[in-house]
Regions:
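The feature captures the alpha-helical scaffold/lid subdomain characteristic of nucleotidyltransferase
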Residues: 14, 18-21, 90-93
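Short, flexible coil/linker elements and helix-boundary hinge sites characteristic
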Residues: 48-49, 83, 123, 162
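Catalytic "initiation/cleavage/transfer" segments centered on a nucleophilic residue
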Residues: 1-7, 12, 21-34, 102-164
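Residue-level recognition of the N-termini of beta-strands and the immediately preceding loop/turn
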Residues: 61-63, 96, 127
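Residues in well-ordered beta-strands of folded domains
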Residues: 15-17, 68, 133
């Protein structure tokens, strides 16, 4: 199977899960697609302290990222098995407040593992940015914002032992 582009992946996503979740509501993707030209999606860009508009491709990415957050293991295995990794690089989802960098399939596995751990232990709103480092560095960095910026480093051993 050839690598999917953003739109192909979006269409595939509709076939396996007709809805996607954000923090507040469940949205029917087919209905969303029908009224697509009328949609304006703005979000508050914390980095630049201004409202920003998502272009069409970014909206696709947003939906995909949201879907991946809700999807099951079989679907994740499908994504990795069919080499759809390129599509998943540098996805930004304003509702989930995360930046995801996935250089390869192995890091992708760790990403899902981390998300599962974080979901069990931390509210997503507490993590504005998740950056997955190169595996050679043997660590995963989660940058959290509270009273002050905090950068916490975890090793793969930490993950396996359930530290996060």
């Amino acid at each position: 199977m050839n690598k999917m582009n953003i739109k192909d992946m979006f269409n595939w996503m509709i076939t396996i899960q007709p809805t996607y979740h954000n923090r507040h509501k469940k949205v029917n993707i087919n209905e969303l697609l029908k009224s697509y030209k009328h949609i304006t999606l703005d979000y508050y860009d914390k980095k630049y302290k201004r409202k920003a508009h998502l272009h069409k491709e970014e909206q696709y990415k947003q939906m995909i990222c949201s879907h991946l957050y809700e999807t099951n293991t079989a679907d994740r295995e499908y994504l990795i098995k069919n080499n759809i990794i390129d599509v998943l690089k540098e996805l930004y989802h304003p509702h989930l407040h995360c930046l995801i960098s996935c250089p390869n399939e192995e890091i992708m596995d760790y990403f899902f593992f981390i998300k599962k751990k974080m979901r069990m232990k931390y509210p997503l709103s507490s993590c504005d940015l998740i950056k997955i480092n190169q595996l050679e560095e043997d660590q995963i960095r989660a940058i959290q914002y509270g009273d002050k910026e905090q950068s916490i480093f975890y090793t793969k051993t930490d993950l396996i032992n359930g530290v996060i």
